[in-house]
Amino acid sequence: MTLKRQLVGKIGEEAAAQYLQQQGYIIITNNYRCPIGEIDIIARDQRVTVLIEVRTRTSLAYGSPEESITAEKARRLKRLALSYLQAYHLSATPCRIDLVAVMVDRETHQVKSIKHIKGILNG
């Protein structure tokens, strides 16, 4: 991953965390890693454990951030959620997986928009 992509990703994750806190979420951890992958943000929304995938883009040339959640990524997110819940003995706790889509200006690196989609893998 290039340094520019890393920077854009970091900007997106920081903006997402700040946005979620403004919405009343309590951030538990950022960049939770386990053998099968990484969860960008884990937070609490009242009594619900929320695992949040952050997708950051500087343009829509390769699709929107939401469109970047492939079937394989969805399967991995489900496995990551199960792994986290089991590791922390939270299997009986309500849980959902959300997406925070962040658009960043390519030149200034300023956040242009944030879109929060709750329960992206429901249904």
Question: Where do the model's predicted regions map?
Answer:
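Short acidic/glycine-enriched loop/turn segments that link adjacent beta-strands
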Residues: P35-G37
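Conserved catalytic cores of phosphodiester-cleaving nucleases, focusing on short active-site segments
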Residues: I39-L60, A71, L77
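Domain-level recognition of nuclease-like catalytic cores that cleave nucleotide substrates
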Residues: A87-G123
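Acidic-basic catalytic patches of nuclease active cores, encompassing PD-(D/E)XK
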Residues: M1-N30
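Short, solvent-exposed loop/turn elements at beta->coil junctions and helix N-caps
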Residues: N30-R33, V102-M103
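Mid-chain, well-packed structural core segment of small domains
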Residues: Y62-C95
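Hydrophobic "anchor" residues on beta-strands that sit immediately upstream
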Residues: I26, T49, P94
